[in-house]
A protein has these predicted regions:
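Hydrophobic, well-structured mid-protein blocks that either form specific transmembrane helices
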Residues: 114-154
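Acidic (Asp/Glu)-rich catalytic clusters
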Residues: 20, 65-76, 96-108, 145-149, ...
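Active-site glycine- and acidic-residue-rich loops that bind
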Residues: 7, 79-92, 125-140, 165-177, ...
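Charged catalytic cores and adjacent phosphate/nucleic-acid-binding surfaces used
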Residues: 1, 8-16, 37, 115, ...
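Active-site gating loops and adjacent loop-to-helix segments of metal-dependent hydrolytic enzymes
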Residues: 33-57, 108-128, 192
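An N-terminally biased module of ancient metal coordination in phosphate/nucleic-acid-related enzymes
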Residues: 1-85, 89, 98-101, 163, ...
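Hydrophobic faces of well-ordered beta-strands that scaffold small-molecule active sites
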Residues: 26-28, 79-83, 107-109, 153-155, ...
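Hydrophobic alpha-helical segments and helix pairs
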Residues: 82-130
Length: 269
């Protein structure tokens, strides 16, 4: 929503559009990226990008508006409170504090930066081979899931493929050992993974995470999976979710999950 720096979608508009599209349940997961952004009330002030101030979500406002729309539209749609935590090892403590501050239903754990370098700008990849930047990315993800436990699902696990050289690099087989180790921790901790339908929007030739990762997750005993349209504007809202359910079923999954107060609720595919 408007509370993230990559969207201008008003929270109430999201809700109205969701009702219009006959979506039964919506969860807000605006972005938080400590390390490269500061909080609204940080005494150091905002970080500037291209002359524009960028901050994390204004949590008190976000929570207040969420409570308002949840009550206002309660007879038409179920709303859930979440955030997407863009964690790095050195920012874990800030997320521990944030998690305790609000009664979240759902938290996506994602890696959007490594060493405070952004993927989408190419800063992180600069001067590294694909082998190097994938290795470092998965190592960061491994270190984070080993040390941080207050989350629901792992977001777009192979996100790097959105920003790699698009030359057919086989990231799954080259990094299968650490991907396996990450998934084992996720499963042991009772967490899940997110399947992110924006892969269609970005014209990627596979699901996100890939079918290989999804099959491996299933083989390892993983059952918790959520489906997200990663919407930043109206035409993204709920996009490709039904199609993704069919693909999950074809891979052998029986159920998908939604969350309530950080507890997964299972629904048949």
């Amino acid at each position: 929503t408007i509370y993230s720096d990559d969207s201008v979608y008003e929270m109430e508009e999201v809700v109205k559009d969701g009702i219009k599209k006959e979506i039964k349940e919506l969860c807000f997961t605006d972005h938080v990226d400590y390390g490269i952004k500061r909080d609204v009330d940080d005494p150091l002030g905002p970080v500037y990008l291209n002359g524009q101030p960028i901050t994390n979500v204004d949590y008190p406002k976000y929570y207040k508006e969420y409570l308002h729309v949840k009550e206002k539209y309660k007879d038409q749609i179920t709303l859930k409170l979440g955030l997407e935590f863009g964690i790095q090892v050195h920012t874990i403590n800030q997320y521990e504090a944030l998690f305790k501050a609000y009664p979240f239903d759902f938290i996506i754990l994602s890696i959007h930066q490594v060493d405070d370098l952004e993927f989408w700008t190419g800063d992180y990849q600069k001067g590294r081979t694909e082998e190097e930047y994938y290795t470092r990315y998965y190592q960061e993800l491994y270190d984070v899931v080993k040390n941080y436990k207050n989350y629901s699902v792992l977001g777009h696990m192979d996100l790097m493929k959105r920003y790699d050289d698009h030359d057919g690099y086989d990231s799954f087989n080259k990094h299968k050992d650490i991907i396996t180790d990450i998934l084992k921790i996720v499963i042991k901790d009772g967490k899940g993974i997110e399947i992110n339908t924006s892969s269609v929007r970005y014209k990627l030739d596979d699901l996100m995470p890939s079918k290989d990762i999804l099959k491996l997750y299933l083989e390892l005993g993983g059952t918790i999976i959520t489906i997200s349209s990663d919407s930043h504007q109206e035409d993204h809202l709920g996009a490709y979710i039904e199609d993704t359910k069919k693909q999950l079923k074809a891979l052998g999954f029986k159920q998908y999950c939604t969350y309530n107060k950080m507890i997964p609720e299972f629904h048949n595919l």
